[in-house]
Amino acid sequence: MKRLEVSNQAKLPTQFGEFYIQCFREKNSNGSKDHLVIFTLDFPENPLVRLHSECLTGDALGSQKCDCGVALQMALERISKEGGLVIYLRQEGRGIGLFNKVNAYALQDKGYDTIQANEMIGFKDDERDYGIAGEILEYYRIKKMRLLTNNPKKIAALEKYAEVTRESLIVCANEHNQGYLEVKKLKMGHLL
């Protein structure tokens, strides 16, 4: 854990129940980035884990363009009952950052899908790196987990660190995110 600085733990009462939070500061040549872990105090040997990338528009503003905010809420609700943790990675817009995400949204408003929009502004379909999540799992000594995801890249990344059983997290489509969800399934291989 040479590149991680770990904060103290603090209580976080939520609408889903009481959690604890802890911050992990990732240090690299570009500076530092803080990631948050939201967890139940006593989680089982095979906990529920949600690897969630930051989505300000979905998580905080309730955007209907994506499934992020609803998926996070569903995960917190299940984890509060069954025990586990959310690893909240600061990788806005599948790793392209908020500024670029807004530019990609503008292209989506013109009819381009999420992948086309990213590529038009010079990015791959997904720029995220999940290596830090593996270090966080090691910190909590998690060797086995039930991963709440539909993303095969997350499964493959975390299988390097622990035994992973996938549990799907299906968010209902709406008129604003239906095309987005179809692209995730057809072009990104999501298990929807």
Curated annotation (Swiss-Prot):
EC number: 3.5.4.25
Protein name: GTP cyclohydrolase-2
A GO molecular function held by the record: GTP cyclohydrolase II activity
GO biological process: riboflavin biosynthetic process
Encoding gene (name): ribA
Binding site for GTP: 50-54, 92-94, 114, 149, 154
One Pfam entry name: GTP_cyclohydro2
Primary enzyme class: hydrolase
Catalysis performed (reactions): GTP + 4 H2O = 2,5-diamino-6-hydroxy-4-(5-phosphoribosylamino)-pyrimidine + formate + 2 phosphate + 3 H(+)
